């Protein structure tokens, strides 16, 4: 019997989590909360408009820990980080809500979104429509669908639920087969290429570059994970990739928003430093 991968363990836990949560708050109750939530802020549109101008469209991630790295940021105040990112030039935010593996929380998403005007994606492992409605009830503007965690029928069902409650969808792929499935099953314009293999957690930017020619021009390619320095950003720009999801590089910095500027808007850093002096 093979040992379950990290992703397989996370997904198994998600099914348990949905059962536990739905026993406390019914889907009907969640739907009422979702209808009463603030209007979505237009996650996909914000990224597309920025990338059209060939400017970095950065989804800046708020993440305390990960299964592969443990605790990444000790001083963790989501609202503070969100404000720092907004000042640093982020287009959107990503907030981890997975409790068991990433030390996330639903409250972190609510706190971050309340502190800024940026659209926010709920970064979690979606396996059931309940979680999609829950995301909207929490105030999220977008949800993540990970192709390697879903079959095509479930993927389509979750995307339909997202559309029903007004959420954008970011579909995440890691290889050619997953990309083909995503393009065939979903019409979302947001295609994220995770440079991290979620089964082994190894990272390679070649993943994005290899898949790029197969992503249609009417979809927005978003490179995720492994962007650590200016050379990485410039490599993507040369290949006409302008949208990024970055977490760890920012979370390890004392000032996450300033690190965002260093990576993506270096001409702004000098001005910011002068303002701080």
Curated annotation (Swiss-Prot):
It comes from the Bacteria. Belongs to the TrpC family. HAMAP family: IGPS_B. GO terms for biological process: L-tryptophan biosynthetic process. Its EC number is 4.1.1.48. This is Indole-3-glycerol phosphate synthase. The keyword Chloroplast does not apply. It catalyses: 1-(2-carboxyphenylamino)-1-deoxy-D-ribulose 5-phosphate + H(+) = (1S,2R)-1-C-(indol-3-yl)glycerol 3-phosphate + CO2 + H2O. Keywords: Amino-acid biosynthesis, Aromatic amino acid biosynthesis, Decarboxylase, Lyase, Tryptophan biosynthesis. One of its GO terms (molecular function) is indole-3-glycerol-phosphate synthase activity. Pathway: Amino-acid biosynthesis; L-tryptophan biosynthesis; L-tryptophan from chorismate: step 4/5. It is an enzyme of class 4 (lyase). The keyword GTP-binding does not apply.
